[in-house]
Each structure stands twice: as C-alpha cells, then as structure tokens.
UniProtKB/Swiss-Prot annotation:
Designated name of the protein: Protein C2-DOMAIN ABA-RELATED 10
Subunit structure: Binds to PYR/PYL/RCAR abscisic acid intracellular receptors in an ABA-independent manner, both at the plasma membrane and in the nucleus.
GO molecular function terms listed in the Swiss-Prot or TrEMBL record: GTPase activator activity; metal ion binding; phospholipid binding
Domain of life (superkingdom): Eukaryota
Gene transcribed to yield this protein: CAR10
Calcium as UniProt keyword: yes
Family the UniProt entry places it in: Belongs to the plant CAR protein family.
Function, in words: Stimulates the GTPase/ATPase activities of Obg-like ATPases. Mediates the transient calcium-dependent interaction of PYR/PYL/RCAR abscisic acid (ABA) receptors with the plasma membrane and thus regulates ABA sensitivity.
Disulfide bond positions: none
A cellular component annotation (GO) from this entry: plasma membrane
Assigned keywords, A-Z: Abscisic acid signaling pathway, Calcium, Cell membrane, GTPase activation, Lipid-binding, Membrane, Metal-binding, Nucleus
Organism encoding this protein: Arabidopsis thaliana (Mouse-ear cress)
Length: 180
C-alpha cells in the first residue's frame, strides 16, 4: 500500500568543488540522487572539475530514516560512465529543526537554529548551519565525497509540505497541522 509522504525535500544542487579527473585533463560530471524508489539526475557539465549546476531536485520523503544517496559520475560517450565518488545526505538534524513548528515564528530572520559538525557519521566537510530565513528553514551543506581521491559537492536543503503530505510535526505528535 502506498504511504503518503511526510513532505517534499528540495535539494538545491549548487556546485562541485575539486572533483576528480577521469578523462585526460578534466571530467564531464553529473549527479544522481537516490532515495527509496526515486532516482533523479542533473545535467552533464562538460570538461569541468568545478562544475556549477544550480539545479533543484525534489523528492518525496515517506520514511525519514531511508538514506539519501548522492553519487557523482563522469559521463563517457563510448564507454560506461566512471564513478567519481558518493555521499549520504543526513537529513535527521534538519528534520529535528523542522519539528520546532510555531516556535520558529518568533525567531529573527537569518537566525541559525542548529549547527551540525562534521564527523565520521556524516559526510560533511565543514560545519553546516540550519537557518530560519524568510519564513523557511534551509540548510547549506558541503559534502565530502567518499570512495574517491578528492571532491566535494555543495547543496542546500529546503522542506515543503503540501496537499497530500502527512507533515513532519503530525508524524511525531499524531495529527498536528502546519501553516505557511
């Protein structure tokens, strides 16, 4: 039976930093995002180890414990695409901040709600702040790629609850509602 999602998570894929070289002097990178049964892909940026995508990908989050996997590939015309690293996106700290609900309305614009430190248990390369900004909660992350010699990916998370979504606060408290 198909379960209604808690909400929609928009992942703003901003850019790659110092990605590995997989062709002669450069790479043709693109990103694949996987969460549960959903797979999304960015466009290929040709001949660039510091690509700028500035693309938004939105995934339905049904189970907040299912990992979001980001994998970078090098596009090849004649052979299989080469893997250029991967990272898991840990959304648990972000979801905890969302559960603050109405308390957030009292915060000043630009206020950092929570700071997440890099550790062995996440793929962060630097501290990441979860911020209340213009009526939304966002989190900027720079992810260190695993299984590769170098490379980072800069993304931003943003949550949306629309019609047909259970909502993050109602899932933890049994039937609340959210307002925007």
């Amino acid at each position: 039976m198909d379960q209604k999602p808690l909400g929609l998570l928009t992942i703003h894929v901003k850019r790659g930093i110092n990605l590995a070289i997989r062709d002669h002097r450069s790479s043709d990178p693109y990103i694949v995002l996987n969460v549960a049964d959903q797979t999304l892909k960015t466009r290929v940026v040709k001949k660039n180890c510091n690509p700028v995508w500035n693309e938004e990908m939105t995934v339905a989050i049904k189970d907040p414990n299912v990992p979001i996997r980001l994998t970078v590939f090098d596009w090849d015309k004649f052979t299989g695409d080469d893997k250029m690293g991967d990272a898991n996106i840990d959304i648990q700290p972000y979801l905890e901040a969302l559960k603050m609900g109405m308390e957030l309305l009292r915060l000043p614009n630009g206020c950092a709600i929570k700071r997440v430190q890099p550790s062995r248990h996440n793929c962060l390369s630097d501290e990441s702040s979860i911020v209340w900004n213009n009526g939304k909660i966002t989190q900027d992350l720079i992810l260190r790629l695993n299984n590769v010699e170098c490379g980072e990916i800069e993304i931003m998370l943003e949550w949306h609850e629309g019609a047909g979504c259970r909502g993050i606060t109602s899932s933890s408290k049994g039937g609340g509602s959210s307002s925007t």
